């Protein structure tokens, strides 16, 4: 009797067979996922678990690379009321949450995206806070953020970080000193930025 199984379930048994199909996800598993990634489903309605320990071969390898997040999910951080937590520039904050059910502990694309996003978020927040605390070279106004999100986005990620267009147009808006009493040539804000390297 000729038999082919996949994930512990029968695909072909003699002349009988079960069909599989793909369906785009309505919701993202990780906040940084591409929209409408595909899930595999049995046409019979039976559950096809992409994250089952019994899944192997090329399909498992592809799922691990596409969905591998080291047992974590990247999601938007919320407070006890369910409201989004925002950074000092008003961007939604991402966090990684450990959830092993229906998941893979392989370090695939989502894992490295999450690590990059965390680095970018920390870097941009630290640099922006230093610059916003300082004054422009003429001492008349506070500095503005160096890093912002691209238009029509509300979360600082490796994909959408950009240099503030206001600074591209007018570099005089960049903070260079910590107070009006500091001389123009001192540029002590740059020293504060340099110290971030060791923090």
Regions found by a protein language model. Give the residues of each.
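Structural signature of extracellular appendage/secretion-system components
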Residues: 1-199
């Amino acid at each position: 009797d000729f038999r082919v199984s996949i994930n512990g379930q029968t695909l072909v048994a003699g002349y009988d067979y079960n069909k599989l199909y793909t369906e785009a996800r309505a919701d993202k598993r990780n906040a940084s996922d591409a929209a409408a990634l595909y899930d595999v489903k049995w046409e019979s309605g039976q559950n096809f678990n992409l994250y089952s320990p019994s899944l192997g071969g090329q399909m498992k390898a592809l799922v691990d690379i596409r969905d591998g997040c080291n047992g974590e999910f990247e999601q938007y951080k919320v407070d006890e009321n369910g409201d989004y937590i925002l950074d000092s520039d008003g961007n939604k904050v991402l966090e990684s949450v450990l959830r092993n059910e229906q998941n893979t502990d392989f370090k695939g694309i989502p894992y490295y995206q999450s690590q990059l996003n965390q680095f970018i978020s920390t870097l941009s927040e630290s640099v922006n806070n230093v610059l916003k605390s300082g004054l422009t070279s003429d001492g008349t106004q506070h500095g503005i953020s160096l890093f912002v999100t691209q238009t029509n986005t509300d979360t600082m990620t490796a994909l959408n970080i950009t240099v503030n267009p206001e600074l591209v147009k007018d570099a005089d808006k960049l903070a260079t000193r910590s107070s009006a009493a500091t001389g123009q040539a001192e540029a002590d804000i740059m020293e504060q930025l340099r110290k971030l390297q060791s923090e």
